[in-house]
Amino acid sequence: MDKHLLVKRTLGCVCAATLMGAALATHHDSLNTVKAEEKTVQVQKGLPSIDSLHYLSENSKKEFKEELSKAGQESQKVKEILAKAQQADKQAQELAKMKIPEKIPMKPLHGSLYGGYFRTWHDKTSDPTEKDKVNSMGELPKEVDLAFIFHDWTKDYSLFWKELATKHVPKLNKQGTRVIRTIPWRFLAGGDNSGIAEDTSKYPNTPEGNKALAKAIVDEYVYKYNLDGLDVDVEHDSIPKVDKKEDTAGVERSIQVFEEIGKLIGPKGVDKSRLFIMDSTYMADKNPLIERGAPYINLLLVQVYGSQGEKGGWEPVSNRPEKTMEERWQGYSKYIRPEQYMIGFSFYEENAQEGNLWYDINSRKDEDKANGINTDITGTRAERYARWQPKTGGVKGGIFSYAIDRDGVAHQPKKYAKQKEFKDATDNIFHSDYSVSKALKTVMLKDKSYDLIDEKDFPDKALREAVMAQVGTRKGDLERFNGTLRLDNPAIQSLEGLNKFKKLAQLDLIGLSRITKLDRSVLPANMKPGKDTLETVLETYKKDNKEEPATIPPVSLKVSGLTGLKELDLSGFDRETLAGLDAATLTSLEKVDISGNKLDLAPGTENRQIFDTMLSTISNHVGSNEQTVKFDKQKPTGHYPDTYGKTSLRLPVANEKVDLQSQLLFGTVTNQGTLINSEADYKAYQNHKIAGRSFVDSNYHYNNFKVSYENYTVKVTDSTLGTTTDKTLATDKEETYKVDFFSPADKTKAVHTAKVIVGDEKTMMVNLAEGATVIGGSADPVNARKVFDGQLGSETDNISLGWDSKQSIIFKLKEDGLIKHWRFFNDSARNPETTNKPIQEASLQIFNIKDYNLDNLLENPNKFDDEKYWITVDTYSAQGERATAFSNTLNNITSKYWRVVFDTKGDRYSSPVVPELQILGYPLPNADTIMKTVTTAKELSQQKDKFSQKMLDELKIKEMALETSLNSKIFDVTAINANAGVLKDCIEKRQLLKK
C-alpha cells in the first residue's frame, strides 16, 4: 500500500561473535564475562545465547542481537533482552508445534467483492503489551469477501499468528471470507529487506533457484498458516533494490518468480483453491509484472486513493486529465477481464499527516470535536467507487479498503491537515463494527449490473451459454462488453437477446444453420453507430461533472455458413460496408433489405460483388423484384483520399496568380475507393442503376457528400527554402516550389506534397548548416546548437544566445558544399507576440585559411573569436525594419568553417534570440578543390604572353563549361565533376608546357 506513514524497519546484520562471544554459549556456575561490540557485559547464569534459541527465525535473532549491541554494558538491560528473547523463542516453539485446523472448503468467488487490508499490528493479539489495541481480525464481518493480512511491526513469533491460523482463518472461512497474505514486491527478487529471498545461497538467481524461492514463498506465506492465497504489492515503495538503489536485474527476476508462484497457486497453478492476487499503484504501461503476470492472477487490485486517484491528474499541456479511472482500466483491460478488476480506497490512519491524507471517507463534523466516529458513506469517494463501473468490458470485480481496522473512524478535517503536532479525536483507536464496509457492500449488492444473466435475457440455452462463457455472467456485462462474440454452435436456434449488446466490437455468426432471419430485433444495438449513454458517478474536472459522450463505433458483422437463413434485413443501420458477409454460403436467401445505409454499390467495389452474389441467390429461389430485394436510399459517406493523383504542376512565367489548393488538392472518395472529383462526376455516380433502380438517394446532394478542404493549410517552399503559407502563388518569376498540404487535425504531417515549376525547373537547395557543429564563439554553446537544429522551435524554448547584445558563433558544416544563399530568423518567426528585440546587425564570415592556420583554430577556437581571423562574405542591417527573417545570395562559397555575429544594439539584457540560421546551397564533395581549379584557370588565362591564343581559348571554354554547370538551375554533381576533371587536365597540360 502506498503509505507514507509506514516506515519499514531495516535491520542491520550484526555478527553474533562480535556481539556476544563464545562465552554466552556455555553455562558456568559463576558469572560469565561476555564481549559485545568490544564492551564487557556481565550476564547471570542460566540465560542462553541468542544463537542457541532454536525456534527463533534468523530475522528475529538479528533484531535481538541489535538490541544487545545497543545495550552495551548495562547488565540489567542485557538480562531483560535475553529474557525477552527466551520468551520469544518459546512463542516461536508454540507456533511451530501448533496444530492447524482442517481447511474449510470455500465456494467459488463471485462479484461484487469487497476486500479489506487489516493491519496486523492493530490486532489485539499482535503485542499484548500494547493495551490500546481493541480490534481483532477475526471480527471482520461476512460482508468482507477478502481479508488481507497487511503485515508490519507484528513479530514473526507473535501469538497473533497462532490466533490467525487456529481461530481467525477457520471463523472467517466459515462465513465465506478468504484470508490472503500480502507481501511486498521485493520479496520476489532478493536484495534489500527481501525476507527469505535474502538467502542467495539457498535461493540463487537461477531457474532452479527461482522455482525454489517461489515454493518457499508459498509455503511460508500461504500454507504455513493455512491461508487462502497470496497478494503481491507492486508499487514504487516496494520495488526491488540493492544497496538502496533500484535493481533492474531484481525486477526481471521478480517477474520470473511471479510466474513460478503462478504455477503453484492461482488459476494456472497446481492448487487452484488458493488465490494469487496482484495489487498495484501503477498504470498498466508502468507495471513491469502485468504483461507476463496477468495470466497467473485471479484478481488485480488497483490503489486509487484520493482525489487524483478518482479524477486523474490535470495535464496543463494537453489541457485534460491524465491517469483517469477509465484510462487506468483501459490500460489493464488488455490483460485481464473486468471481473478480475478491483479498485481501492483508504480509511483514515491514526496520526496521518500530509501526503497520507486521502479524504476517501467522511470527515469529522466540526461540532463533533469529542467524537471521532462517522459511519455515513453518503457522498464519499468510497461510495462512488462502490457505484462506479467501467464503461467498457464489463462490470468490475468489486472494491477494497486499506486499513479496514479503522472502519467507522472519521477522517481528520482538512483544516488540520498541515498541523503536524495537532492530535484530533479521529487519531484515537476505536473498536470497529465495520458499518462502513457493510454499507459499501450493500451498495454493490443493490447494483442491478451484478444481476446474473438468465433465460429472460437469452431464451436460447445454447446462445446463453456461449454469451456467458465469452462475455461474462452479469447483466451489466452486456452493455459494456466491447470485444468479439463468436457464435458457432449449430444448436443455437434463436438469437433473441443479442440486441442488448451496445458496444460489441465484432459479432461472428458462423455455421448457425437453424437461424432463418436476421434483423434489428436480434442484432446488436450498435449495428448503427451511436453515443455512449453510460454516465460516470465519479467526480471529474468538468464544472458540471459531465463528460462528453464517446462515439460507439458500429459492430463488425461476420456471417458465414447460415445455410438456413432466408431473410436478411440490414436496412437503416448507416453501414458503409457489406464486408464480412460470406454471401456464397447464404444459400437459402429469399429476401434481402440493405436500403437506407451508406453503401457504395458502384461496379467493381467489394460491396457490389457481395450484393450481386446475394441477388443471384434470391433470383434463383424466388426471383428478384422490389419486394424481395431492396437496396435504395444509400447515402455514401465521403472521405478524404489517402493519396492524391496530381503531384506536379508546370506553369509558364506570367503575371498571374494560381490557386494551389484548387489545382492540387481535390476529390472525395467512398470507403470502397470510388473517387469523385467534381459535381459532374457525382451526378454520373448518382444516376448509376442496378437492375433499372438507382442505389444513391436522389435527395442526397453533392454538397452533403463531398469533403471540405476549406480549413486545410499549405506550406510553399521555394528553391532557397524560403516559405510562405499563402494558397495563392504568383507566377511572375522563374522558380520551383515544394507545396505541402496539411489537414486541420495534424499540422505536422503533410497529407499531400506536390512540385510546382514556374518556367524552367530549379534544383531545391539544401540547408548545409543543419546539424552543424558549434566549435566556439561567445554565445551560450547549448543554445547555439539550437540555431542549427533545422527547426524554429516552440514559443517556450529558451534560445537566448547569452547575456550581451552582441554574440558570435563559430561553427563547422557537416559536409562539403557549394554555398549560394543564407538566411536567419528573428524570434518573431516562431512567436509573433515576442518581446525579444530583433537583430539589428549581423555579419557572416568564413575563416581566413590563406593567412591563418586551421589546426590552431581547431585546437582553441575561442582564441579565434576575433574579426581579424575571418573574412566577411555578407552583412545585414535592419535600418529600422522589424523583419521576421533576412536572406541574401552568396557567390559559390566552399568554406566549411564559419563565424556569424548577431547584434541587437541594446543593453546587456537584450541578448540575441535567433531560432534558426540557414547556410544554403548544394552538397558537393571536394567543392573547395573544384573552386580552386576555377581560380587557377582564371589566373592562367591572364598569362597571355606564355600561351597561344588557341590554348587560351580552349582553357576559357573549359572554364566556362565548369562555371556554367556550377551555376546551372539544375545542379548536376556528375556534370560538375566531369567538367572539373576536364578543366583540371587542361590546366595540368598548360602548366607542363609552361615549365
Swiss-Prot record:
The lineage of its organism: Bacteria, Bacillati, Bacillota, Bacilli, Lactobacillales. Its main location: secreted. Residues 765-923 are annotated as: carbohydrate-binding module (CBM). Its EC number is 3.2.1.96. A glycoprotein binds at residues 151, 153, 186, 237, 303, 305, 349-350, 356, 402. InterPro entries: EndoS-like_Ig-like, EndoS_F2-like_TIM-barrel, EndoS_helical, Glyco_hydro_18_chit_AS, Glycoside_hydrolase_SF, LRR_dom_sf. It comes from Streptococcus pyogenes serotype M1. Gene3D superfamilies: Glycosidases, Ribonuclease Inhibitor. GO terms for cellular component: extracellular region; host extracellular space. The keyword Zinc-finger does not apply. This is Endo-beta-N-acetylglucosaminidase EndoS. GO terms for biological process: carbohydrate metabolic process; symbiont-mediated evasion of host immune response.
